[in-house]
């Protein structure tokens, strides 16, 4: 017996690649035949390109329009980059699955090699306060300028010498077949990524038990634990993409995880990287407690 499922996604090249990755996984793992229809849309984050994301005045700018197709019954599921999904969603969808996570690391695309090799005063492109803070913490002499656009656009801006370098998520370059553009890759404990980077989240309506059962075969327990723990930290701290905060979790055997939380000043004047191990619940509680102490000390 076959199942029909409509998949909502953003219309960018990377989003379509991510969606096809999910479809292929579902077709491979499902005990039933699955017929899939892709439903494309554009998010506010895709349309508004003249401002940094954190200045758009709302959360989930890459997510809401896609989830709306699900809520309106025009699609059964939506595929998102987990880093784009807010830690608090105020409308009736559930995360039905987190497929196996790919590379969570940040990387540099550069005309001059690594970050340390960039000439004094070089211009690095990013609109992320978190990336800006960590770049300036390492190299306060650099100029960090806003950079929006999809992955192809940002790489092209470096090639055209509009910027000397740019910091991006390595997974996006990998999925686009552009890994050769990477000049340097950063350990997530040294250059802390945002919650959810490298993972996908598949959402559906809260009451859609049929879809939830169908997606059980693509839900990866280890990846879900990592992403949910990262999201729990930012939710408890009440921070989002507008704050220079990064968090990365690596699940170990059983209920054991390692958590890294980075708290920074956007101008690069100060940075604190907290590291801890334990159960997901314990590390969230400890990370939030230590972070609040750091933040209260200024």
Swiss-Prot record:
<dbReference type="Pfam" id="PF03900">
    <property type="entry name" value="Porphobil_deamC"/>
</dbReference>
<dbReference type="InterPro" id="IPR036803">
    <property type="entry name" value="Porphobilinogen_deaminase_C_sf"/>
</dbReference>
<dbReference type="GO" id="GO:0004418">
    <property type="term" value="F:hydroxymethylbilane synthase activity"/>
</dbReference>
<keyword id="KW-0808">Transferase</keyword>
<keyword id="KW-0627">Porphyrin biosynthesis</keyword>
<dbReference type="Pfam" id="PF01379">
    <property type="entry name" value="Porphobil_deam"/>
</dbReference>
<dbReference type="GO" id="GO:0005737">
    <property type="term" value="C:cytoplasm"/>
</dbReference>
<dbReference type="InterPro" id="IPR022418">
    <property type="entry name" value="Porphobilinogen_deaminase_C"/>
</dbReference>
<dbReference type="InterPro" id="IPR000860">
    <property type="entry name" value="HemC"/>
</dbReference>
<comment type="pathway">
    <text>Porphyrin-containing compound metabolism; protoporphyrin-IX biosynthesis; coproporphyrinogen-III from 5-aminolevulinate: step 2/4.</text>
</comment>
<dbReference type="GO" id="GO:0006782">
    <property type="term" value="P:protoporphyrinogen IX biosynthetic process"/>
</dbReference>
<dbReference type="InterPro" id="IPR022417">
    <property type="entry name" value="Porphobilin_deaminase_N"/>
</dbReference>
<protein>
    <recommendedName>
        <fullName>Probable porphobilinogen deaminase</fullName>
        <ecNumber>2.5.1.61</ecNumber>
    </recommendedName>
</protein>
<comment type="function">
    <text>Tetrapolymerization of the monopyrrole PBG into the hydroxymethylbilane pre-uroporphyrinogen in several discrete steps.</text>
</comment>
<comment type="similarity">
    <text>Belongs to the HMBS family.</text>
</comment>
<feature type="modified residue" description="S-(dipyrrolylmethanemethyl)cysteine">
    <location>
        <position position="241"/>
    </location>
</feature>
